[in-house]
Amino acid sequence: MHKILLVIFAGVSVWAFSPSALVNDARAQIGVTLRYDPSYSRIDYPMGDVAVEKGVCSDVVVRALRVQRIDLQRLIHEDMRANFAAYPRRWGAKTTDRNIDHRRVLNIATYFTRKGYAVRDEFAAGDIVTWDLGGGLTHIGIVSDRRKGDTPLIIHNIGHGTQEEDILRKFKITGHFRIY
């Protein structure tokens, strides 16, 4: 009996997610990721990344989750490869591209929704939020454990490197996700 249980547990991967660690891992990018750079880059797979001193809003989320051992590059690539029609066609792609798919806000939101991470609760530290900035622009950030009054701050990169700012209600919220 004990040998059977050991075999069963050996095949189960243990995943422990910490919202406070996610916030700290995002905050650690402040002063490191210094500029916004949306240029296309060929990157390693899995666990590929552009140079840490640059990036876009989604890179803040991707990098913080990687410290939690969650590789959105691999997860989104695999889900898109198996379910390509479920993802936005906004970029005219006819197939997946593991260099960029995980860096697109709409793809991240689609993946999180498909996995059941969308919530309607109050915002909590470690939650991930997406916005419509208008003009076809989207944005993503991580809810901080710090507040300005009653409003949680957001850790994000909207053009000047990774910052922690009061922008939660500045733009139209299009998604609210909790992956723990």
Feature names for model-found ranges:
Residues 15-113:
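N-terminal capping segments
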Residues 72-73, 143, 172-175:
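A structural signal for short, hydrophobic beta-strand segments that form beta-sheets
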Residues 4-12:
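Sec-dependent N-terminal signal peptides
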Residues 150-180:
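Low-complexity, Gly/Ser/Thr/Pro-rich intrinsically disordered linker/tail segments
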Residues 23, 81-159:
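...with weaker cross-activation on analogous glycine-rich loops/strands in unrelated enzymes
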